[in-house]
Amino acid sequence: MIPLVALLVLLTLQASPGDIVSVNVTDTATLTVGDSCMYFVDNLQPSINATPGEYEVKIGINCTPGLKEVYADGSVLAQIDVNETTIDYQAYAASLEKENLALQKEVESLKEKLKISQEQIETLKSQLEDLQNKAKMLGIQNELQKQQIEELQKKLERAKTELQKKKSDLDELEEKIRELNRQSSIYRLATFFMVSLFVGSFVALVFVARKE
């Protein structure tokens, strides 16, 4: 029993040399062709490791008429009846030349696209490098700003300490001034008392002298 289902996209299983037929598989398998004149278009080889999907088989221009098989893991998956045909090799060569020119143009187009893609990649690499450099610079600036902030915080702490010391010194000076004011008041009172005593004594002496 064949575990795979094969469907030929062509309306019939008939094919002529130079044709391409499509085989659709629904499971993984190793596909092989029964005649070396045929090959798979995907890898240009007579066998291919297939996953579910569609695979094209090229019927070579040198294929002889008759039934040709396509196998899946050794079991016949499909039969292709290759017709006998008279080939105009000159027309076929012209067709191949045309296809070759088309392929060359496609290759040139792909090369140009590849070149553009490579240039875009280089541009993106340059932009990425610039962004990385900017990120590094921002990191350095951020680190410097952190250091500056830390230094300012240290200066602020020193200023706070100095201010506290100045306040303490000011309190001491104010206390000294109050003490000096108290002492000054005492000195003034003592001086006034001494002056009053002296004046009183002097007046008393004068008064006594006049009586005599």
Swiss-Prot record:
One of its GO terms (cellular component) is membrane. Residues 1-18 form the signal peptide. The keyword Transmembrane helix applies. It comes from the Archaea. The chain crosses the membrane at residues 186-208. InterPro entries: P-loop_NTPase. It is found in: Membrane. To A.fulgidus AF_0540. This is Uncharacterized protein AF_1225. It comes from Archaeoglobus fulgidus (strain ATCC 49558 / DSM 4304 / JCM 9628 / NBRC 100126 / VC-16).
